[in-house]
């Protein structure tokens, strides 16, 4: 198989099925569709297990978009931010669906997105026998957002389907007018 030479790889993220997949996310310069190559670490799959093409919403700037995937999702879902919006990309259905908008400042930019990682949790801290706690960590998505005058961190609890949960406290906005967060370049989680 030949790869279109006009495609530029914008990111490679890992996730899906316990973290066994890598997704190479490519697009032509200033393009309005993504080509995603799915690579598998599973013996029964070919190394390049699939290729997907997804049309993007018109407001998405692929040059500045950020991407993430989580080990908790087996349904070929990746997540993308552009501007002040978060999208779920359903590779199997070939759709990008808007999940969240930071409405406080329409000119804000989501500059980082990261899922919590169960491998960072000590076994003794996971007191649920079913492992639900670790699974929920993989469905907790943090966003680093820069507005004109400050940084904001938003944490979203997602559902098994990759939607924002409708439960109470499923969207947490971390900001303090007394102690402004400066410009955000990345976010990480500390489990101490």
Q: Across the structure, where does each feature detected by a protein language model lie?
A:
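Hydrophobic/aromatic hotspots within intrinsically disordered, low-complexity regions
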Residues: 133, 137, 141-143
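Repeated scaffold domains used in trafficking and secretory/extracellular systems
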Residues: 6-17, 58-70, 106-122, 181-191
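A short beta-strand motif characteristic of beta-propeller blades
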Residues: 1-3, 48-58, 95-103, 167-178
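Short coil/turn segments that connect the beta-strands within blades of beta-propeller domains
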Residues: 19-20, 74-76, 139, 192
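Short loop/turn segments that connect beta-strands within beta-propeller blades
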Residues: 40-43, 91-94, 159-160
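Intrinsically disordered, low-complexity Ser/Thr- and acidic-rich flexible linkers and loops
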Residues: 122-132
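Structural motif
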Residues: 30-38, 84-89, 149-157
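Residue position within the beta-strands of beta-propeller blades
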Residues: 24, 79-80, 143-145
